[in-house]
């Protein structure tokens, strides 16, 4: 009888120990879950603190061969902004682009020139969207536009690619809800000459007109950096060349 009682007590004790072990494991899981949630919140807050007010991405083709060509209007305009703020670009591997940040009225703004060829601009824009901004509406893409004449500059809040292969690639990865600043380069005499047209330098008259368009946009740089889009549109579109 005594042996039976001892056996029963041992079983009961074993069961209690198992229950205690299970409760400890459950308690550990609850603690770990809370800890992981807290860590995630801290990481999210830190990432949000690193997000930028605006990223301005200038499209173009890298290399001396394509410097100052029609397709590189985006690059050229960003160079002017950098000059305005007396700063220089440095390569940032994380987004595979030439990159610089500027401070303006308590805001941080990035100037970005993708290192990929213009038809593959989506790669950098996808990384910009992932690491640098809260929303695609905080991205301004600067590019050439054959539907506008040299000297024309317009702002667009969203839309399609209008045949621009750089925009086409961007739309595939981040959608169409980003702002665009479009500099006119005009049409070639024949549609068949489009590919060669965009990678050639503008003639002297076109160059002067494009310089005027750059100047008009630079005159609005404060508003651009503050994302006062409607004011900019009103100014640029009401003073069309």
Question: How would you label these PLM feature ranges?
Answer:
Residues 21, 186-194, 200-205, 209:
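RNase H-like, two-metal
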Residues 9, 13, 30-157, 168, ...:
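Nucleotide and nucleotide-moiety/phosphate-recognizing core
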Residues 1-31:
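Cationic, amphipathic, low-complexity alpha-helical segments enriched
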């Amino acid at each position: 009888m005594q042996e039976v009682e001892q056996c029963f007590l041992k079983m009961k004790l074993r069961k209690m120990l198992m229950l205690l072990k299970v409760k400890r494991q459950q308690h550990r899981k609850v603690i770990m879950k809370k800890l992981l949630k807290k860590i995630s919140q801290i990481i999210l807050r830190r990432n949000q603190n690193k997000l930028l007010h605006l990223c301005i991405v200038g499209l173009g083709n890298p290399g001396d061969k394509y410097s100052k060509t029609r397709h590189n209007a985006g690059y050229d305009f960003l160079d002017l902004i950098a000059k305005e703020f007396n700063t220089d670009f440095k390569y940032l591997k994380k987004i595979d682009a030439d990159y610089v940040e500027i401070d303006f009225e308590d805001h941080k703004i990035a100037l970005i020139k993708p290192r990929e060829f213009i038809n593959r601009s989506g790669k950098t824009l996808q990384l910009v969207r992932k690491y640098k901004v809260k929303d695609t509406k905080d991205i301004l893409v600067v590019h050439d536009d054959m539907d506008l004449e040299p000297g024309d500059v317009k702002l667009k809040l969203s839309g399609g690619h209008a045949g621009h292969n750089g925009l086409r690639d961007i739309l595939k990865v981040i959608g169409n809800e980003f702002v665009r600043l479009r500099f006119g380069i005009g049409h070639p005499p024949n549609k068949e000459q489009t590919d060669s047209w965009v990678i050639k330098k503008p003639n002297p008259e076109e160059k002067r007109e494009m310089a005027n368009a750059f100047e008009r946009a630079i005159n609005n740089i404060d508003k651009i950096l503050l994302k006062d889009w409607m004011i900019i549109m009103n100014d640029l579109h009401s003073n069309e060349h």
